């Protein structure tokens, strides 16, 4: 039977209730605000963020009661928890230092893990690099420009395993609303990237691999193989063989060819 995971997310900057933009942001981001307007009134308060922590526990209980096998606390792709990861300039309990920026993620996971047992797991999707230079993105240092610096992402995955008891995470990169080519390398899309898709594939799998090798006890699922289309299965097999990940999550491929996994099992390859 399929292993069903319910994703728990706060849309943050991309909140769209009633099909009307209503951004809720961690801090003002001049680059992202070129794509979607926001102002100081959109910045969420510490009290609001604190109130969200238990919401992830409530979501876990609902997911468990609905028959899901796991809940995934989402901290990637430009949504609220991921934006807090780069809230270096935000004052208060949810910004500035590493501990504050990941307070909501960690406390949300703790609230969800109350309902964990042999039949229900808590996991997370974690963005390890946004694609922007400091101070506008996570996974970089003040000195690294837009080159990934995985010191903090590696620390986070270590702590998710050692402190919170997470056994499994999915790692990913980028913001599909803005740095789409970082999240999912492509050769046909809404803009022309300034790099070959292979560059994005390499950055993704080797970045994830660096974290996996630093935290080998964590089961790590990698992301974004679909650009390779019919060769994505071979890419995945090689990544697992080289110890860069324990498995791969497919997004676009699953939409385009929902039966692709059965094709691999039955025929040995994606058709």
PLM region descriptions:
Residues 1-271:
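Flavin-dependent oxidoreductase catalytic cores
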């Amino acid at each position: 039977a399929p292993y069903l995971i319910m994703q728990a997310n706060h849309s943050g900057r991309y909140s769209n209730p009633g099909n009307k933009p209503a951004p809720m942001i961690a801090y003002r981001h001049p680059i992202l605000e070129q794509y979607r307007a926001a102002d100081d009134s959109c910045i969420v308060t510490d009290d609001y963020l604190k109130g969200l922590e238990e919401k992830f526990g409530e979501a876990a209980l609902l997911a468990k009661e609905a028959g899901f096998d796991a809940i995934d606390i989402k901290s990637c792709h430009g949504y609220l928890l991921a934006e807090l990861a780069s809230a270096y300039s935000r004052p208060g309990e949810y910004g500035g230092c590493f501990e504050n920026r990941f307070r909501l993620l960690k406390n949300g996971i703790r609230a969800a893990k109350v309902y964990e047992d042999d039949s229900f797991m808590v996991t997370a999707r974690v963005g390890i690099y946004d694609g922007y230079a400091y101070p506008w993105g996570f996974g970089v240092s003040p000195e690294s420009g837009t080159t990934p610096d995985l010191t903090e992402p590696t620390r986070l995955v270590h702590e998710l395993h050692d402190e919170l008891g997470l056994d499994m995470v999915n790692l990913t990169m980028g913001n599909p609303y803005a740095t789409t080519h970082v999240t999912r390398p492509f050769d046909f899309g809404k803009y022309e990237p300034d790099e070959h898709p292979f560059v994005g594939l390499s950055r993704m799998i080797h970045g994830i691999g660096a974290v996996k090798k630093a935290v080998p006890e964590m089961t790590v699922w990698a992301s974004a193989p679909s650009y390779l289309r019919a060769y994505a299965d071979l890419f995945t097999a090689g990544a697992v063989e080289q110890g860069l990940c324990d498995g791969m999550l497919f997004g676009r491929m699953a939409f385009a060819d929902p039966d692709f996994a059965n094709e691999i099992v039955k025929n040995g390859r994606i058709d």
